[in-house]
Regions:
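Phosphate/pyrophosphate-binding catalytic cores of soluble transferases and nucleic-acid-acting enzymes
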Residues: 1-221
Length: 221
């Protein structure tokens, strides 16, 4: 095939990767009127009551989705209202044969201690680059805590720091801990859910990278 049509996809979010690797049954398009009705109902009831109402029609999704996850709550409600089938039904329609495309899956699984050290340093770099000022600016415009941006790792801790509710050292420590826990969940997901073609545990090992490159060349034919 044309080499320019070959794609390299890099990411760490397990659910997106799962959807990419498996050809899922397409969910019918949701009419705008249903989307509007769902949002109005959620705003009227509040997230917690809306989730309880969702559980009567789609208990599987309601159990999986946290009350604060507005977007996913709305999506589950919209799908059921439009199709009269729960979102879990559509997720179960994935084909066992997987995607029509061929993938060579490379998984980066660094040693946990090294990974956690990088997580800690990464957040310190954010601090040096002005993350606290960004947190203060975001808080000043009263962004909804239910928006995805408000769930950024470390944001809540930095906002507490800017309000004088936490010392900077405590905010950093708590944010670093949250980041490490997130990384741990990702490692667990990849270990149990991804059937990789090549595993890289040491990025600085030239032989490992060379071996991976050779396998990719063989895969491409």
């Amino acid at each position: 095939g044309d080499v320019y049509k070959r794609q390299i996809i890099c990411g760490g979010t397990g659910l997106y990767i799962k959807f990419l690797l498996n050809e899922l049954s397409a969910i019918p398009e949701i009419p705008p009127s249903i989307k509007l009705e769902a949002r109005e109902k959620l705003e009227d009831l509040g997230n917690k009551n809306f989730r309880e109402l969702l559980s009567k029609n789609d208990p599987v999704s309601a159990r999986r989705i946290k009350s604060g996850d507005t977007n996913r709550l709305l999506r589950a409600w919209e799908v059921f209202t439009a199709t009269n089938k729960p979102l879990s039904y559509w997720h179960e329609q994935s084909r066992e044969t997987g995607s029509q495309h061929k993938f060579f899956k490379v998984c980066l699984m660094p040693e946990r201690k090294a990974l956690y050290s990088k997580c800690d340093k990464r957040f310190l770099d954010f601090i040096e680059q002005g993350a606290a000022d960004e947190a203060r600016a975001l808080d000043s415009i009263n962004v909804s805590p239910e928006l995805p941006a408000s769930k950024t790792l470390g944001l809540l801790e930095l906002i507490k720091y800017t309000k004088g509710e936490l010392e900077l050292s405590d905010a950093v420590e708590q944010a670093q801990r949250a980041t490490r826990l997130y990384a741990k969940r990702q490692l667990t997901w990849f270990r149990h859910q991804l059937d990789e073609d090549f595993l890289i545990q040491n990025l600085s090992c030239s032989k490992t990278v060379s071996d991976c490159f050779k396998k990719i060349v063989n895969f491409l034919g």
